[in-house]
Design a protein with these regions (language model features):
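Hydrophobic alpha-helical membrane-embedded segments
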Residues: 1, 35-39, 71-82, 142, ...
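Early transmembrane hairpin module of multi-pass membrane proteins
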Residues: 1-41
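Cytosolic/stromal cytosol-facing helical appendages immediately following the last transmembrane segment
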Residues: 1-18, 89-220
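Residue-level signature of transmembrane alpha-helical entry/exit and packing/kink sites
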Residues: 24, 60-68, 118, 137-138
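Hydrophobic alpha-helical transmembrane segments of multi-pass integral membrane proteins
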Residues: 29-44, 70, 121-127
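Juxtamembrane helix-loop-helix connectors linking adjacent transmembrane helices
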Residues: 38-74
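Membrane-water interface at transmembrane helix exits
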Residues: 39-43, 47, 79-87, 129, ...
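Function-critical hydrophobic alpha-helical transmembrane segments in multi-pass membrane proteins
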Residues: 60-93, 97-100, 109-113
C-alpha cells in the first residue's frame, strides 16, 4: 500500500547530507520545531502577561465545541490559500522548493520546509491570539498543523495488521500534489480545489485538464 515503490533517496546531492531522510529530519527540527516553539511561546507569553484573552470550557462550553467543529475548516481554508501563494514563482523558487524536493514523501517530509514556509504554514493557530478560545483549542490546533503532516506524508495509503486494515494513512489527494505540483493545493476537509478548478483525482482526464489549465495560464 505504498504509493511509490522506491525508497527514500540516498546519495542524492539535492538533499542535505545527500540523504533524503536526514535532510527531512534537519528541516523538520531546525525549521519546523523552531517555528512551532516560537509560536507557542508567543501565545503563552501573551496569556501570562494579560495580552491574550482566553475563553475556557467552563465559562463557554458551546464556544469550545464550535471551535472543535471549525478547526478543520479554518486549517483547510488557510492551507489552500497560503499554498497557492507559495506556488507564486518567486516564493516557489526560493522557499517552497525545499519541501517540494520530496516527490517521494515520508513521515519526516511533513514539516520539512524552509523557515519562511514554516512561518507562513504554521500561522493559522495565531487566530487564537485575536479571538479568545480555550488554551486546549490552541494546543490542538498547533498539533494538527505540525504533527498531522507526518501522517499524511507517510507515503503509505493504509496501515494494516496482516490482512486487517487498521486505518487509512497518507493523504492520496496531497500525494498527487507532490507528484503533479500544480493541483490539489488544499485538503478535502474544505473542497476548495473542487470549487476553484484545481482538483486532481488521479485520472488521465484530470492530468490533461491540469495541463490545459497551466498552458492557458502561461499564455496570459
Amino acid at each position: 500500500f505504498k504509493f511509490l515503490k522506491k525508497e527514500m533517496a540516498k546519495n542524492n546531492k539535492k538533499f542535505k547530507f545527500s540523504n533524503q531522510v536526514y535532510d527531512n529530519i534537519f528541516w523538520s527540527v531546525f525549521s519546523g520545531v523552531t517555528i512551532w516553539t516560537f509560536y507557542e511561546a508567543i501565545y503563552w507569553y501573551g496569556i501570562a502577561n494579560g495580552i491574550v484573552k482566553t475563553s475556557s470550557f467552563q465559562s463557554s462550553p458551546v464556544q469550545f465545541f464550535l471551535w472543535i467543529i471549525c478547526l478543520p475548516l479554518i486549517r483547510g481554508t488557510h492551507f489552500y490559500f497560503i499554498h497557492r501563494l507559495l506556488h507564486v514563482p518567486f516564493l516557489y523558487k526560493h522557499v517552497h522548493v525545499t519541501h517540494h524536493r520530496n516527490v517521494n514523501t515520508g513521515p519526516w517530509s511533513g514539516i520539512s520546509m524552509h523557515p519562511v514556509e514554516n512561518i507562513i504554514y504554521q500561522s493559522s493557530p495565531l487566530i487564537h491570539i485575536f479571538i479568545p478560545s480555550d488554551p486546549m483549542i490552541f494546543t490542538l490546533h498547533l498539533i494538527l498543523v505540525t504533527l498531522n503532516p507526518a501522517f499524511t506524508h507517510s507515503g503509505f495509503e493504509q496501515i494494516k495488521n496482516k490482512k486487517t486494515k487498521l486505518l487509512d494513512s497518507a493523504d492520496f489527494h496531497h500525494q498527487l500534489h507532490h507528484r503533479y505540483f500544480d493541483c490539489n493545493y488544499g485538503n478535502m476537509d474544505v473542497p476548495l480545489d473542487v470549487w476553484f478548478g484545481t482538483h486532481h483525482d488521479g485520472s488521465e482526464e484530470a492530468t490533461k485538464a491540469m495541463r490545459l489549465r497551466m498552458k492557458g495560464a502561461a499564455t496570459k
